[in-house]
Amino acid sequence: MVDKGVKIKVDYIGKLESGDVFDTSIEEVAKEAGIYAPDREYEPLEFVVGEGQLIQGFEEAVLDMEVGDEKTVKIPAEKAYGNRNEMLIQKIPRDAFKEADFEPEEGMVILAEGIPATITEVTDNEVTLDFNHELAGKDLVFTIKIIEVVE
């Protein structure tokens, strides 16, 4: 039985409430969903339960499962990537991009001082950056299968 402190391997499919797959450890599922990344290794995810390596709701979901068990759980935003934080949205002068080797465009993801940010608005004078995680504020649905307890 899975408990805190136990190292396990799981296969998973992560979906938005709409049913759109945003992440998976299963290559065929990634291809079917149109999110396949050729340089990624699709294999069971290995982690120690309770060490905070994954989102809280995922770690809680695997507790008391057994090898071979599979279940689908809905994880509320507050136990996933958190609720959206308006303090993480910043307007900066468009002039700040003068030295950049690109033109800022809505929807573009950039690294601002090493932190990913999505450009949500571009005007003549300002660029709005959103530093919230792309899944912040979203309830997630995971199908999780316990593959192995690692000794």
From Swiss-Prot:
* Any matching Pfam family: FKBP_C
Q: How is its activity regulated?
A: Inhibited by FK506 but not by cyclosporine.
The reactions it catalyses are: [protein]-peptidylproline (omega=180) = [protein]-peptidylproline (omega=0)
The residue ranges of the PPIase FKBP-type domain are: 8-109
Instruction: Indicate the temperature dependence noted in the record.
Output: Thermostable.
Kindly report the protein's main subcellular placement as a broad class: cytoplasm
A cellular component annotation (GO) from this entry: cytoplasm
Q: What is the effect of changing residue 22 to Y?
A: Loss of both PPIase and chaperone activities
Q: A GO molecular-function term, please?
A: peptidyl-prolyl cis-trans isomerase activity
Record's InterPro entries? PPIase_dom_sf, PPIase_FKBP_dom
Q: Which key words tag this protein in UniProt?
A: Chaperone, Cytoplasm, Isomerase, Rotamase
Among the GO biological process terms of this entry, one is:
protein refolding
Task: Cite the effect that the entry attributes to residue 23 to V.
Answer: 69% of wild-type PPIase activity and 78% of wild-type chaperone activity. Loss of both PPIase and chaperone activities
Q: What is known of its domains?
A: Contains an N-terminal PPIase domain and an IF (Insert in the Flap) domain. The IF domain, formed by an insert in the flap loop, is required for the chaperone-like activity but not for the PPIase activity.
PANTHER family attached to this UniProt entry: FKBP-TYPE PEPTIDYL-PROLYL CIS-TRANS ISOMERASE SLYD
Give the family this protein belongs to, as stated in its UniProt record.
Belongs to the FKBP-type PPIase family.
Could you tell me what this protein is called?
Answer: Short-type peptidyl-prolyl cis-trans isomerase
